Amino acid sequence: MTHPAYGVLRQVSPTASVLLENNPSSMTLEGTNSWVLRAPGASSCVIVDPGYDDRPHLELLAAVAPVALILLTHHHPDHADGAPWLASAVSAPVRAFDASLCLDGDALQADEVLSVAGLEIGVLHTPGHTADSVSFRVGGEVLTGDTILGRGTTVLDDLGAYLGSLRVLAELPEGTPGLPGHGPELPDLRATAREYLAHREQRLDQVRGALRELGPDATPRQVVELVYADVDRALWVPAEHSVRAQLEYLRTL
């Protein structure tokens, strides 16, 4: 698969540019968005989510500008695996919410504000996709990692935590641009978060209906076969992961 954005740093806003990694799949869409944050006129930059340990992609990131900091939205390999090589290549620290991912830097804290490379970057802890998922607020924009994608919906570990994260994002100012970990930019992240909330409530209603039909001890696979009968079977494995999170959520109510 080819894509015109592979290998090309694309300016999205005065502060943010994106380099699309060539790792397309049903889960990553066209590939991982590696974000380069750079204040106008600044000599250095911040890189968010270097992606896989893909040397051509990482070498392009390393060549953009001196790198002051590498940030990770979460631990999944399509976002984080390239961080150690890039950190060594550009002599920059790595920071993430999960301390085990950090290199020469402290773990990120919820609501922390980072002052780096002429930027003020706010840390929003947005768990649900993973426990360590964070979003970054830079100026009027928010980098969402896999918490909200540019297209479609994300896979969940913890639905209760995820609904809380969506409610936080749903209170952002109207028209806040969203810069996701996969897929195109979102013109209004608040509106998208509210759409995600409505979608999750709809899915929960479907799962409740499936449990009424199948019985309270139905397995995630049985629920997927009923609720996702009209969905491509290639997506049933991630759907089963999300249904498991929904069942766990419903069984704690």
Which ranges hold each PLM region?
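Histidine-centered divalent metal-coordination motifs
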Residues: 73-79, 129, 182, 246
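Active-site HxH/HxHxD metal-binding segment of metal-dependent hydrolases
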Residues: 23-31, 45, 50-122
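Glycine/proline-rich low-complexity segments that form flexible loops, beta-turns, and polyproline
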Residues: 1-2, 129
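A structural signal for the main folded, soluble domain(s) of proteins
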Residues: 9-11, 36, 41-44, 67-70, ...
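Metallo-beta-lactamase
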Residues: 42-47, 52-53, 120-125, 130-210
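C-terminal regulatory/interaction regions
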Residues: 210-253
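Conserved beta-strand hairpin/beta-sheet module of binuclear metal-dependent hydrolase folds
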Residues: 2-63, 134-147
